[in-house]
Amino acid sequence: MIALLLFLVTSRTVTAQSEVVDEPEANPGRPTVSTPATLTPVGYLQFETGFTPAYDSPEFSSRYSLNEVIKLTIASRLEFLVQAEPIANFTTDGATANRPADIFLGAQGVLYHGEGATPTLAVSYFHRVYDGGAPEFDYGSPTNSFLVLASADVKGFHYDANAFLTELVQEPVRRGQFGQSLTISHPFLKRFTLSGELWHFTQPFLRGNAIGNLWAVSYTARKNLVFDTGFNHGLSGTSTRWEAFVGFTYLLPHRLWKAQ
């Protein structure tokens, strides 16, 4: 993956410079459904790379995919994002195939910078620019997505809360979808963080609800490098029964342009 190559190339340079210049700090958005309302450092590329096996879902019996999110904050209140699954291997109706999945372009804007228990508030928008045709997870693959995000720290715990309004399409029919997610995280053993999450999405074409409970552990190897692993268990009959996650978030330590 792109992030792994960049990490290997830059690691020696970063080590040599670490005594002189502090590393910028990554702001992971994976592997939870919720996205932080806060943005990545201005002028730095952040890569969120992972592998996701999943089992027993309405559209597949098994699915294995690589996933990548690239983020770039260009101002203190504006971030651009690319989200993609380069390849997905899946089994459905007894047949196994490989296919690229979807690509999304999006932007996130901060409405209010909070501090401590006062939440940071943001909104974001995503549009699917490529449909690879791979079977989707229980919450579908929206053509358009609008999110409202809030993040804050309260008594040693951090939370990320998202509300989703999306558009699902099965030609020629278009239907609205609603969702909510809440992630609560707490650090332990200095470099580790435990995250628990509950999420819900309506399923307008199935006339059901996808509900899941996700747990993840992350390890901060450096300020700009965070590893993660976890799992998600579907709680409704039309949810993906099991998903696992393993990956990392890497913030490229070189600013793309000089600070103002």
Residue spans of the language-model regions?
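Catalytic cores of secreted/periplasmic lytic hydrolases that degrade extracellular macromolecules
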Residues: L4
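C-terminal segment of classical bacterial N-terminal signal peptides
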Residues: F7-T15
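Transmembrane beta-barrel domains of Gram-negative outer membranes and organellar outer membranes
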Residues: A16-Q260
